């Protein structure tokens, strides 16, 4: 069991509305922390502020970050997660909402259907760069679409391809998340730490974000290497 505050905690309106939302959910979090006698982990569903939102980090109730990298894969890259770890290395993170299977991507160069390959890339990337996991989601399920006629044409940023619950439940990406889980359990991902490329190599190379994402065991006897392409 995990307490997850809200959804899009801060909202997307700057200034006072944002401040009010952050403050209001903070009060909810403190109340949950006070009333929960079981030490249940608590987090908040971050807004999509690529790479990471900037609130709650140092607060005692905030046990781990539930990030939202969002639903367009072109900008998402390992340097986001590496930069987060350098700044907030003691606060665990999970990639909580990125590239739900079958969603309509939000990208400047046009909408695409999110494939299993796209979500697999960000899932492995997040874990290989120090994340504790990835939260899988699928269009048609989270928005409760039983029939194509259920789609609201006036509020339909993410389901432009007519994805229903029946199609989404058998999405190949869901099965592949099972492979991901078994792989990391078998290889004890908790014993691995991210391998960080040299600062200079990462900053000057135009291909830096295409480098393999690698983790190594603390005794340097094992390595897990992921190539995103």
For each of these PLM feature ranges, what is it?
Residues 1-95:
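Active-site neighborhood of glycoside hydrolase catalytic domains
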Residues 101-103, 117-229:
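Aromatic- and carboxylate-lined catalytic core of secreted/periplasmic carbohydrate-active enzymes
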Residues 42, 49, 77, 110, ...:
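Generic preference for well-ordered secondary structure
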Residues 18, 26, 50, 82-85, ...:
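Arginine residue identity/basic-tract feature
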Residues 13-15, 52-55, 105, 146, ...:
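Short, solvent-exposed polar/charged micro-motifs at secondary-structure junctions
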Residues 37-39, 59-152:
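Catalytic-core region of carbohydrate-active enzymes that cleave or remodel glycosidic bonds
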Residues 17, 21, 73, 111, ...:
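Residue-level preference for long, well-ordered alpha-helices that form the structural scaffold
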